[in-house]
Amino acid sequence: APGEQEDIHGEPFVGRAGKLLDKILTAIDRSRGDDVYICNVLKCRPPNNRDPLPSEVEQCESYLHMQIKLIQPKLIVALGRVAGKTLLGLDVQLKEMRNETYEYTGIPLRVTYHPAALLRNSNFKAAAWDDFKWIRSFLEKN
């Protein structure tokens, strides 16, 4: 879901989490716009930056699915539990979704930590970096 800065600018990942995501993308030789398309599960900001309610996700889900259908990415990377849960239909902890390649409408999908979680808890950074190294390797091969 968009945060305060994203809501103001009308673009995903423009705040602190977005800056961190840009650094991670640069580290794996990727960049926004050129070969990375970023979108949110929720298209509007929940009050007080809370997690989206299931009813809110349901209202926006068809837009997300249409974006994916139009873009036809080589790989979908779900950033965070909400994105993973929405795309996979699994109600489990993020750590249970990581390190496995799923399929979403025939497109490989991986789940990793949301950059905001990395800002809140640096203990997740090594695992997230492993995820992004896997992403780099996958994209180099495909």
Feature roles, as predicted:
Residues 1-142:
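A polyanion-binding, active-site-adjacent surface
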